[in-house]
Amino acid sequence: MANGTNASAPYYSYEYYLDYLDLIPVDEKKLKAHKHSIVIAFWVSLAAFVVLLFLILLYMSWSASPQMRNSPKHHQTCPWSHGLNLHLCIQKCLPCHREPLATSQAQASSVEPGSRTGPDQPLRQESSSTLPLGGFQTHPTLLWELTLNGGPLVRSKPSEPPPGDRTSQLQS
């Protein structure tokens, strides 16, 4: 019992403590304009939390161990995931495909202006022998990787349609 005088008698009075009192009077009319702000803040923070969890899971799925990435059993299913490490790929690819400045200038000065051979022509000849004609490599690559490696260039109109393409039959 609250007062402890008679433990057998029921206690019907109520005691008000300082914890239950509103020390600062709040006017409801002032809160009416902001009554949905708590709900909006809750849903925005919940959405931000879900997006953060999604990004963490996505990063964890990309960061596999180096042994797993280099193993022949590991095939990458998403060819667009290369594009997210674009600056790293460019830094890796550019030094191995560029010649020193002095040798490329010497080759460029010895070539006729109208000819198609240039400092990048040997790279195209070497890489065209490694790539199958009209096909992709065993691992999917992006178009910018193919052009950096000297692969096939993208043309606006192909010489012949891909197999199974019926658009040319519909036009005639």
UniProtKB/Swiss-Prot annotation:
Query: What residue stretch is flagged as signal peptide?
Result: none
Organism for this UniProt entry: Homo sapiens
Q: Its function? A: Modulator of melanocortin receptors (MC1R, MC2R, MC3R, MC4R and MC5R). Acts by increasing ligand-sensitivity of melanocortin receptors and enhancing generation of cAMP by the receptors. Required both for MC2R trafficking to the cell surface of adrenal cells and for signaling in response to corticotropin (ACTH). May be involved in the intracellular trafficking pathways in adipocyte cells.
Membrane-traversing stretches: 38-58
One molecular function GO term is:
type 4 melanocortin receptor binding
Is Transmembrane one of the keywords?
A: yes
Q: How does it assemble?
A: Homodimer and heterodimer. Forms antiparallel homodimers and heterodimers with MRAP2. Interacts with MC1R, MC2R, MC3R, MC4R and MC5R.
Q: Which disease is it linked to?
A: Glucocorticoid deficiency 2: A form of glucocorticoid deficiency, a rare autosomal recessive disorder characterized by resistance to ACTH action on the adrenal cortex, adrenal insufficiency and an inability of the adrenal cortex to produce cortisol. It usually presents in the neonatal period or in early childhood with episodes of hypoglycemia and other symptoms related to cortisol deficiency, including failure to thrive, recurrent illnesses or infections, convulsions, and shock.
Q: What is its main location?
A: membrane
Protein's membrane topology: Single-pass membrane protein
Keyword tags = Cell membrane, Endoplasmic reticulum, Membrane, Transmembrane, Transmembrane helix
Q: Which portions of the sequence form the region Disordered?
A: 105-136, 151-172
Which InterPro entries does the entry link to? MRAP
- Any one Gene Ontology cellular component term annotated for this protein: endoplasmic reticulum
| Keyword flag Membrane | yes
State its location(s). Cell membrane; Endoplasmic reticulum membrane
- Protein's name according to its UniProt entry: Melanocortin-2 receptor accessory protein
A GO BP term, please?
regulation of adenylate cyclase-activating G protein-coupled receptor signaling pathway
Pfam families in UniProt = MRAP (PF15183)
The text of the family note is: Belongs to the MRAP family.
Tissue specificity statement from the Swiss-Prot or TrEMBL entry:
Expressed in adrenal cortex, testis, breast, thyroid, lymph node, ovary and fat. Expressed in adipose tissues.
